[in-house]
Amino acid sequence: MKILLILACVIACACGERYCAMKSDTDLSCRNSTASDCESCFNGGDLIWHLANWNFSWSIILIVFITVLQYGRPQFSWFVYGIKMLIMWLLWPVVLALTIFNAYSEYQVSRYVMFGFSIAGAIVTFVLWIMYFVRSIQLYRRTKSWWSFNPETKAILCVSALGRSYVLPLEGVPTGVTLTLLSGNLYAEGFKIAGGMNIDNLPKYVMVALPSRTIVYTLVGKKLKASSATGWAYYVKSKAGDYSTEARTDNLSEQEKLLHMV
């Protein structure tokens, strides 16, 4: 509260009689010697009045918001991660609704400059929202994975093994991909993506799907121990194109599967 009062004093010095601060807890007169008492002075400045009455509530909201952003990752908590995704999905429509409402309110009071800025903000928000959906649908078309609609997903790693496709969302395109096999469990980027595998099940190539293209990574080296189903395999970029990442179960060669177009 003292910080808010100091802030109010600074604003009072800059803005004259609209904002003020109390001389003491008992004296309700303003420090800048205005005729009105501090209650009317605070009410006259909406921002200061709001901070003075809602600062604790906003601090709790911001603490929760920071916690969700900081620890909203699957390796920490799936629950917090789900809340983070919900917030990110709701931000676009909420911001769009706020800009439209602000445009309406500014038009009602004939503030046409702010009305223009509000309309521009609404258009930009809507375009960015549509771009998100377009990119997500393009990525889903390649991978058939709901991770495509994750706002943080820039690419999806696709590994075909045992007749199935295993996917992992990525925040960027890697230079190389390492698959680690530990006691029959397959790991990529530190995450377990499959179980019950042996060295013969490791694929000859993996793919990283982007909205615009699919990058193929070919196996270039591996070190495996058959007795314990443990080892690693390393893949590097070999080609890129409009390839499908779906696992094929029909009688196709590896090259034919690779050239299967979306």
From Swiss-Prot:
GO terms for molecular function: structural constituent of virion. GO terms for cellular component: host cell cytoplasm; host cell Golgi membrane; membrane; viral envelope; virion membrane. It holds the Pfam family CoV_M. Its main location: virion. Glycans are attached at residue 32. Residues 69-77, 134-262 are intravirion. Keywords: Glycoprotein, Host Golgi apparatus, Host membrane, Membrane, Transmembrane, Transmembrane helix, Viral envelope protein, Viral matrix protein, Virion. It is found in: Virion membrane; Host Golgi apparatus membrane. HAMAP family: ALPHA_CORONA_M. Component of the viral envelope that plays a central role in virus morphogenesis and assembly via its interactions with other viral proteins. Homomultimer. Interacts with envelope E protein in the budding compartment of the host cell, which is located between endoplasmic reticulum and the Golgi complex. Forms a complex with HE and S proteins. Interacts with nucleocapsid N protein. This interaction probably participates in RNA packaging into the virus. This is Membrane protein. The lineage of its organism: Viruses, Riboviria, Orthornavirae, Pisuviricota, Pisoniviricetes.
